[in-house]
Amino acid sequence: MNGLGVGGSQSPNLVNAANAILYAFMTITCFAGPWLTNIIGFRWTLALGSVGYPLYAAGLYHNNRTGAEWFVYFGSVMCGISAGFFWSVEGAIATGYPEAHKRGRYIATWFSFRNFGNIIGGSISLALNHKVNRRGKVGYKTYQAFIAIQCLGLIFGLFLSNPEKVQRDDGTKIEAPRGIKWREELKQMWKLLRSRQILLLTPLFWYFGWIQAYPGTYLATYFTVRSRALGSFMSAVVGTLSTWLAGMLVDIPWAKKRQTRAITTFIFIAVVNSATWIWAVYIQNEYRHTKPVLDWGNLSAFGRGFGVYMFERITFSLVENYVYWCISNLSDSPGDSIRYSSLLRGIETAGVAVGFGVQAVPTALIATASINCGLWFLSLPFSFYATVQVVRKFNELEREREAKAAGAEVGDDDSRA
């Protein structure tokens, strides 16, 4: 829905403020995700985590029809409470269930399913709003479609298999301890929070959260309703392609060593994302003076503004896949993965809450774009060192495999002797 630009609303300030509240509550419940999962399991946590989304969409629908704002805030609070649990457990499932050499593609599959919902929603929105070549809000039927789709989340979540019932293709079982007391869980979370891996990834996750307020506000400020609907659809399409590109770069053996693939993928993402944010600041500086209204009917002006938005979505998906691939290779099981996922997604949602709060003031978009660019360059060295940690773990695993192979050869020689 945010792919429509501030949820398809005419008022960026209202939805940005509501999203700030939503993500503030999500920050709390993200950190509580491992505790709830220990009690009721992955399946029920995922299903219950989806119940707030249709309430959020219903609030926007009510505002669209009546102009009332209270339901928007109510829906944001309810969505924030439930979605934090959803976010923490979905990340653990995507990073902890697959084998190490498949994790990039499994993460891409996870984001593809999420983008598939955006593609469906974007298609519906584009079909309903394709004639509205002015700025404003999307039609109310758009929200009805979103509410119907989101209500299916609870049902489909119950089809998930808990980790202890999953067997990987290589025959290994997944360890996911249950019944851990809350004091022990809190102790493990505190220990992980102070670890080098979390500290190195924190700047990148804060950046990743902070930037999410900007693209939708940019879209709502400068583009017509039908162009925003097109943006919602196309952002899901390019996001899916980008996350698969990142997943294949780290998984497909185009280079023999996974260490080489990790470093090369990081460099590729760093270069593309750096260029995108420099371009975004340049375009935004121009638009603060010209204040255009962009529509695909005027392709010469539309293409530049829409192009930078597309690249922001492309690089967002590249970074998203890569950071979760890092998590998946720093943790060894869904039990560990849900702690990594909860902590880092909690940091991400805190960044999102602050980002939307700042944008709701409102803040000049040139300032927001410049801060986004600065945060990216600030997070780069930390992200590189996090990549180095993953490479070191790969080296350790290789040494362990070589030692086991050598031990097996010695055993064979002894038996023959």
Each PLM stretch: what is its role?
Residues I28-W70:
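Conserved MFS/SLC helix-loop-helix module at the cytosolic interface between two early adjacent transmembrane helices
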Residues M78-E90, E99-K102, F311-V323:
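Core transmembrane helices of Major Facilitator Superfamily
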Residues G3-L14, L60-W70, T95-K102, N118-Y143, ...:
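Extracellular/lumenal inter-transmembrane loop segments of multi-pass membrane transporters
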Residues N19, F25-T27, C79-F86, H101-G153, ...:
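Glycine-rich segments within core transmembrane alpha-helices of 12-TM secondary carriers
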Residues V166-W182, R392-A417:
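Intrinsically disordered, low-complexity terminal tails of fungal membrane proteins
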Residues N13, W44-L60, T260-A280:
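Structural signature of the two symmetry-related core transmembrane helices
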Residues L4, L160, Q167, T172-S341, ...:
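Membrane-interfacial loop- and helix-cap regions that link adjacent transmembrane helices
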